[in-house]
């Protein structure tokens, strides 16, 4: 096992956080918390599983988190067109009035502490693990809240695409029937069509760019044989890196542990949102996946009223402990539900 060797200056600074002199201890603890401030702020968002879905916007003091909604809604596209003009005549007027969405922000907080002996003995390994647990608590909460917002928007839109049965909008039934829980490339193809047709307008109005799915679905992809894909594509799958992002038809596939039978996001859709799996062609489907249009970052917003603040906790000394606590305030919103849909297989 390799142990990291820390400079004497860092060792002395850590030991000072457990110093018997209250003034020395308070100063050292404050400096320790200040040093953690920026790395923790970065780490909280670098390690989330939202994968750049949300546009993060830090609000100025006193600013409101309000966003204008799109003038054009599905089904209304034909009302917003240009006109062929006669040689003489008045240009038609078009009056629009939009709505605004006010996004509520809320505060989340966390804390962690450790025995003073770890500071006295300069046990960086123990204390850094504790700090990673502190950071992971924020990451876990951000992931959960952000994805519940996406899942709620997808459920509210109500568009569910399957590889079995008739396709949305077109009613096509040419796709062969797949076994329940089996992820197929036909599902991606149908989701692409549904995303574009459901966006309204022409083919540039929306497109499927990313799909978030379970590890078992990716396992199905790795098991595709020559009846599913050609040898060249199979080789690309076999030699892909451990954490490389696979693509099918130009759609990026994101493997997530939270999707799959009995997993967190699956349970949220079924239990909290009361969504049940369909039975298509006498086959009851088993899993959900989520498709997003991230071609334009205009729909998924994360207003941040207060970035993560971390402070030392001087009240723990009587208990022979030291620690930190902190909070941040933010919100989540999906402004345009046309950018999200559910896949089921």
Annotated model-derived regions:
Residues 116-118, 215-217, 328:
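Short, flexible loop/turn elements at secondary-structure junctions
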